[in-house]
């Protein structure tokens, strides 16, 4: 930035620089140049100039003259900055940049920005809110996934019902003997449902019906099967041929 005249407004300096491919880039504002410098894209060997001067100078020349980088203070050009600093020292010697100053600032490493990178947009990357990947999830990653949203679906309920029906189906040999209704036990899921439908106990102050004791007897009729049926049942149970004489 620099002042336009003695009492003019402060104008932001625009910069041009030479990339590693010797191509000219710019103009860019001082805030953009400062962002790329802090990100590690620039070093002391960077060739740059303001829009107010025809010749390029290294970033190291600016840093040695000012004691820091030139992107956070009002500057017009390197020559104008030297003249301004000389005017502030009327009794001192004129400050001149040594001719061989550029050779003292060897780049420690190649500059890492690619030629095709849209440099003016870099300083906006941290100003556009959270990364796009954060919008793909409907909840924060720290929150656990709700298991109810995954297990209580129509497909899972149908699969559970099919498994219950398969477990409740009697063996084939009971069906062949007409005994499919004997020995059938309620499934665990049915026991839970039956337990849920048990009426709750009443309060102690609520009157109940008088208990009536009764004795009940029952007679179980025997199941008659033939030798052939018994032989087939035993063969299926033992896994080998059984012959009843």
UniProtKB/Swiss-Prot annotation:
Per UniProt, residues of the GYF domain are 12-60
Which is a Pfam family this sequence falls into?
GYF
InterPro entries listed in its UniProt record: GYF, GYF-like_dom_sf
Q: Which GO terms describe its cellular component?
A: cell cortex; cleavage furrow; cytoplasm
Would I find Zinc among this entry's keywords? no
Q: Which GO terms describe its molecular function?
A: WD40-repeat domain binding
Q: Which SUPFAM superfamilies match?
A: GYF domain (SSF55277)
Q: Which domain of life is it from?
A: Eukaryota
Q: Where are the transmembrane segments?
A: none
- Biological process (GO), any one: Notch signaling pathway
- Gene inactivation effect: Partially penetrant phenotypes when temperature elevated to 25 degrees Celsius which include embryonic lethality, reduced brood size, egg retention and an increased incidence of males.
Q: Which Gene3D superfamilies match?
A: 3.30.1490.40
Q: Is Secreted included in the keywords of this UniProt record?
A: no
Tell me which UniProt keywords the record has, alphabetically. Answer: Developmental protein, Notch signaling pathway
Question: Which residue ranges are recorded for the region named Disordered?
Answer: 126-166
Record's function text = Involved in negative regulation of early and late embryonic Notch signaling.
In Swiss-Prot or TrEMBL terms, this protein is called Suppressor of aph-1
Q: Which organism is it from?
A: Caenorhabditis elegans
Gene field: sao-1
């Amino acid at each position: 930035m620099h002042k336009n005249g003695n009492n003019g407004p402060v104008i932001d300096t625009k910069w041009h620089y030479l990339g590693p491919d010797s191509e000219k880039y710019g103009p860019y504002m001082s805030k953009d140049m400062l962002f790329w410098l802090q990100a590690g894209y620039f070093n002391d060997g960077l060739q740059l100039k303001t829009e107010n001067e025809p010749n390029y100078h290294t970033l190291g020349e600016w840093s040695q003259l000012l004691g820091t980088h030139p992107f956070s203070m009002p500057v017009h050009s390197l020559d104008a900055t030297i003249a301004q600093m000389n005017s502030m020292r009327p009794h001192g010697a004129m400050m001149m940049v040594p001719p061989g100053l550029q050779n003292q600032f060897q780049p420690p490493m190649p500059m890492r920005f690619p030629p095709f990178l849209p440099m003016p947009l870099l300083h906006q990357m941290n100003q556009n809110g959270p990364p796009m990947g954060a919008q793909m999830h409907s909840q924060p990653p720290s929150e656990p996934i709700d298991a109810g949203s995954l297990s209580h679906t129509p497909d899972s309920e149908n699969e559970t019902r099919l498994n219950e029906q398969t477990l409740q189906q009697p063996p084939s040999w009971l069906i062949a003997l007409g005994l499919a209704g004997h020995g059938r036990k309620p499934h665990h899921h049915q026991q839970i449902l039956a337990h849920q439908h048990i009426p709750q106990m009443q309060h102690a102050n609520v009157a109940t019906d008088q208990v009536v004791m009764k004795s009940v007897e029952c007679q179980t009729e025997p199941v008659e099967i033939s030798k052939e049926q018994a032989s087939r049942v035993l063969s299926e149970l033992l896994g080998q041929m059984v012959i009843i004489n």
